[in-house]
UniProtKB/Swiss-Prot annotation:
Subcellular location: Virion tegument; Host nucleus matrix
Zn-finger segments (unnamed): 167-179
Family per record: Belongs to the herpesviridae US10 family.
Protein known as: Virion protein US10 homolog
Keywords: Host nucleus, Late protein, Metal-binding, Virion, Virion tegument, Zinc, Zinc-finger
Pfam families: Gene66 (PF02053)
Lineage: Viruses, Duplodnaviria, Heunggongvirae, Peploviricota, Herviviricetes
One Gene Ontology molecular-function label: zinc ion binding
One Gene Ontology term, aspect cellular component: host cell nuclear matrix
Taxonomic source organism: Cercopithecine herpesvirus 1 (CeHV-1)
Regulation: induction: Expressed late in the infection cycle.
Protein backbone atom coordinates (compact mmCIF):
# COMPACT_ATOMS: atom_id res chain seq x y z
CA UNK A 1 0.00 0.00 0.00
CA UNK A 2 1.06 3.57 -0.51
CA UNK A 3 0.65 5.74 2.49
CA UNK A 4 -1.59 8.70 3.17
CA UNK A 5 -3.35 9.93 6.27
CA UNK A 6 -7.11 10.18 6.48
CA UNK A 7 -9.52 12.07 8.68
CA UNK A 8 -12.65 11.88 6.56
CA UNK A 9 -12.71 15.38 5.17
CA UNK A 10 -11.27 17.25 8.16
CA UNK A 11 -7.59 16.48 7.61
CA UNK A 12 -5.44 17.79 4.77
CA UNK A 13 -4.25 14.30 3.85
CA UNK A 14 -7.63 12.60 3.63
CA UNK A 15 -7.71 10.15 0.66
CA UNK A 16 -10.32 12.37 -0.97
CA UNK A 17 -8.61 15.66 -0.15
CA UNK A 18 -7.11 17.63 -3.01
CA UNK A 19 -3.35 17.43 -3.29
CA UNK A 20 -2.85 14.72 -0.66
CA UNK A 21 0.83 13.81 -0.39
CA UNK A 22 2.42 10.47 0.31
CA UNK A 23 4.26 10.19 3.62
CA UNK A 24 6.92 7.73 4.82
CA UNK A 25 5.68 4.23 5.68
CA UNK A 26 4.35 3.78 9.16
CA UNK A 27 2.40 0.98 10.74
CA UNK A 28 -1.03 1.65 12.26
CA UNK A 29 -0.74 2.70 15.87
CA UNK A 30 -2.82 1.05 18.61
CA UNK A 31 -5.89 2.93 19.70
CA UNK A 32 -5.76 4.94 22.88
CA UNK A 33 -8.24 4.74 25.70
CA UNK A 34 -11.02 7.26 25.59
CA UNK A 35 -11.51 9.02 28.89
CA UNK A 36 -15.06 10.30 29.09
CA UNK A 37 -15.78 13.23 31.40
CA UNK A 38 -19.14 14.33 32.67
CA UNK A 39 -19.89 17.98 32.10
CA UNK A 40 -19.47 20.09 35.26
CA UNK A 41 -22.66 21.03 37.01
CA UNK A 42 -24.59 17.96 35.91
CA UNK A 43 -26.34 15.77 38.43
CA UNK A 44 -23.95 12.88 37.99
CA UNK A 45 -20.87 15.11 38.31
CA UNK A 46 -22.19 16.65 41.52
CA UNK A 47 -22.91 13.21 42.92
CA UNK A 48 -19.29 12.18 42.35
CA UNK A 49 -17.82 15.29 43.94
CA UNK A 50 -16.68 14.81 47.54
CA UNK A 51 -17.02 17.39 50.29
CA UNK A 52 -13.39 18.41 49.93
CA UNK A 53 -13.96 19.26 46.26
CA UNK A 54 -12.23 16.19 44.80
CA UNK A 55 -13.97 13.79 42.48
CA UNK A 56 -15.07 10.43 43.80
CA UNK A 57 -14.99 7.10 41.93
CA UNK A 58 -16.63 7.08 38.55
CA UNK A 59 -19.98 5.36 38.35
CA UNK A 60 -19.85 2.93 35.39
CA UNK A 61 -23.63 3.20 35.11
CA UNK A 62 -23.44 6.94 34.56
CA UNK A 63 -22.27 9.11 31.74
CA UNK A 64 -18.78 7.60 31.57
CA UNK A 65 -19.93 4.42 29.83
CA UNK A 66 -22.41 6.31 27.67
CA UNK A 67 -19.66 8.62 26.41
CA UNK A 68 -17.88 5.61 24.93
CA UNK A 69 -20.73 5.21 22.45
CA UNK A 70 -21.08 8.52 20.57
CA UNK A 71 -22.82 6.77 17.67
CA UNK A 72 -26.00 6.26 19.73
CA UNK A 73 -27.50 9.58 18.64
CA UNK A 74 -26.84 9.34 14.93
CA UNK A 75 -29.32 11.43 12.90
CA UNK A 76 -31.15 9.73 10.06
CA UNK A 77 -29.83 12.40 7.69
CA UNK A 78 -26.32 10.99 8.09
CA UNK A 79 -27.47 7.49 7.18
CA UNK A 80 -29.11 8.77 4.00
CA UNK A 81 -25.78 10.07 2.72
CA UNK A 82 -24.17 6.62 2.87
CA UNK A 83 -24.24 4.36 -0.19
CA UNK A 84 -27.25 2.04 -0.12
CA UNK A 85 -25.11 -1.06 0.28
CA UNK A 86 -23.54 0.28 3.49
CA UNK A 87 -26.68 1.46 5.27
CA UNK A 88 -27.73 -1.93 6.75
CA UNK A 89 -24.29 -2.39 8.32
CA UNK A 90 -24.26 1.12 9.75
CA UNK A 91 -27.72 0.53 11.27
CA UNK A 92 -26.40 -2.61 12.98
CA UNK A 93 -23.44 -0.62 14.35
CA UNK A 94 -25.73 2.07 15.78
CA UNK A 95 -28.02 -0.56 17.34
CA UNK A 96 -25.01 -2.27 18.93
CA UNK A 97 -23.84 1.10 20.29
CA UNK A 98 -27.20 1.71 21.94
CA UNK A 99 -27.34 -1.81 23.34
CA UNK A 100 -23.83 -1.50 24.78
CA UNK A 101 -24.45 1.94 26.29
CA UNK A 102 -27.26 0.45 28.38
CA UNK A 103 -25.05 -2.22 29.91
CA UNK A 104 -23.95 -0.09 32.86
CA UNK A 105 -21.36 -1.98 34.88
CA UNK A 106 -22.07 -5.25 33.05
CA UNK A 107 -19.49 -6.20 30.40
CA UNK A 108 -20.36 -5.74 26.73
CA UNK A 109 -21.75 -8.67 24.81
CA UNK A 110 -19.06 -10.73 23.10
CA UNK A 111 -21.81 -12.19 20.92
CA UNK A 112 -22.57 -8.69 19.67
CA UNK A 113 -18.88 -8.14 18.95
CA UNK A 114 -18.73 -11.40 17.00
CA UNK A 115 -21.81 -10.44 15.01
CA UNK A 116 -20.41 -7.02 14.13
CA UNK A 117 -17.13 -8.61 13.04
CA UNK A 118 -19.00 -11.09 10.85
CA UNK A 119 -21.15 -8.39 9.25
CA UNK A 120 -18.14 -6.16 8.56
CA UNK A 121 -16.14 -9.03 7.08
CA UNK A 122 -19.00 -9.88 4.72
CA UNK A 123 -19.36 -6.26 3.62
CA UNK A 124 -15.60 -5.85 3.23
CA UNK A 125 -15.18 -8.97 1.14
CA UNK A 126 -18.04 -7.98 -1.16
CA UNK A 127 -16.62 -4.49 -1.58
CA UNK A 128 -13.07 -5.76 -2.04
CA UNK A 129 -13.94 -7.98 -5.00
CA UNK A 130 -14.89 -4.94 -7.06
CA UNK A 131 -12.65 -2.26 -5.57
CA UNK A 132 -9.08 -3.49 -5.26
CA UNK A 133 -7.82 -0.34 -6.98
CA UNK A 134 -9.88 2.03 -4.85
CA UNK A 135 -8.10 4.97 -3.21
CA UNK A 136 -9.58 3.99 0.18
CA UNK A 137 -8.39 0.36 -0.03
CA UNK A 138 -5.55 0.77 2.53
CA UNK A 139 -7.75 2.32 5.20
CA UNK A 140 -10.58 -0.13 4.77
CA UNK A 141 -8.17 -3.06 4.92
CA UNK A 142 -6.50 -1.64 8.02
CA UNK A 143 -9.91 -1.18 9.67
CA UNK A 144 -10.98 -4.72 8.78
CA UNK A 145 -7.79 -6.26 10.12
CA UNK A 146 -8.04 -4.20 13.33
CA UNK A 147 -11.58 -5.50 13.96
CA UNK A 148 -10.57 -9.07 13.11
CA UNK A 149 -7.80 -8.92 15.73
CA UNK A 150 -9.93 -7.22 18.40
CA UNK A 151 -13.22 -9.15 18.18
CA UNK A 152 -11.95 -12.48 19.63
CA UNK A 153 -10.54 -10.76 22.74
CA UNK A 154 -13.34 -8.25 23.34
CA UNK A 155 -13.87 -7.90 27.10
CA UNK A 156 -14.39 -4.25 28.06
CA UNK A 157 -16.50 -1.30 26.97
CA UNK A 158 -13.32 0.32 25.69
CA UNK A 159 -12.83 -2.69 23.41
CA UNK A 160 -16.42 -2.42 22.18
CA UNK A 161 -15.99 1.31 21.61
CA UNK A 162 -12.88 0.72 19.50
CA UNK A 163 -14.59 -2.04 17.51
CA UNK A 164 -17.76 -0.07 16.77
CA UNK A 165 -15.96 3.17 15.91
CA UNK A 166 -13.63 1.30 13.55
CA UNK A 167 -16.56 -0.37 11.81
CA UNK A 168 -18.33 2.98 11.44
CA UNK A 169 -15.10 4.49 10.08
CA UNK A 170 -15.00 1.71 7.48
CA UNK A 171 -18.54 2.59 6.36
CA UNK A 172 -18.02 6.34 6.29
CA UNK A 173 -14.92 6.19 4.13
CA UNK A 174 -17.45 5.76 1.32
CA UNK A 175 -18.70 9.35 1.78
CA UNK A 176 -15.63 10.99 3.25
CA UNK A 177 -16.19 14.33 1.55
CA UNK A 178 -19.63 14.85 3.12
CA UNK A 179 -19.57 12.74 6.31
CA UNK A 180 -21.03 14.56 9.31
CA UNK A 181 -19.19 12.14 11.65
CA UNK A 182 -15.76 13.29 10.52
CA UNK A 183 -15.05 14.96 13.84
CA UNK A 184 -15.75 11.72 15.73
CA UNK A 185 -13.27 9.78 13.62
CA UNK A 186 -10.65 12.50 13.99
CA UNK A 187 -10.93 11.96 17.75
CA UNK A 188 -11.41 8.20 18.03
CA UNK A 189 -9.85 6.61 14.93
CA UNK A 190 -6.51 8.34 14.52
CA UNK A 191 -4.77 4.97 14.85
CA UNK A 192 -6.17 4.12 11.39
CA UNK A 193 -5.07 7.28 9.58
CA UNK A 194 -1.66 5.80 8.73
CA UNK A 195 -2.54 2.61 6.93
CA UNK A 196 0.85 1.65 5.50
CA UNK A 197 1.76 -1.92 6.31
CA UNK A 198 -1.89 -2.79 6.85
CA UNK A 199 -1.25 -6.30 5.55
CA UNK A 200 -3.19 -8.31 3.03
CA UNK A 201 -6.96 -8.28 2.65
CA UNK A 202 -8.76 -9.42 5.77
CA UNK A 203 -10.38 -12.23 3.77
CA UNK A 204 -6.94 -13.82 3.55
CA UNK A 205 -5.61 -12.97 7.02
CA UNK A 206 -8.68 -13.30 9.26
CA UNK A 207 -10.87 -16.25 10.04
CA UNK A 208 -14.28 -16.50 11.62
Amino acid sequence: CRVRQCALGVHESCPLARGAKLSPGQHPRPSHAVRGRTAPGTRSSRRRTCEDGTSGPRDPRGATVALLYPLCDQPSAHLQTLPLEHRPLFRVIVEASRESSRKGDAPPSRRTGTRIHRELKLAHNQWLRANRESAIWPWRTAAMNFVAALAPRLQTHQHMHDLLMTCAFWCCLAHAATCSCAGLYSTHCRHLFRAFGCGGPASATASG
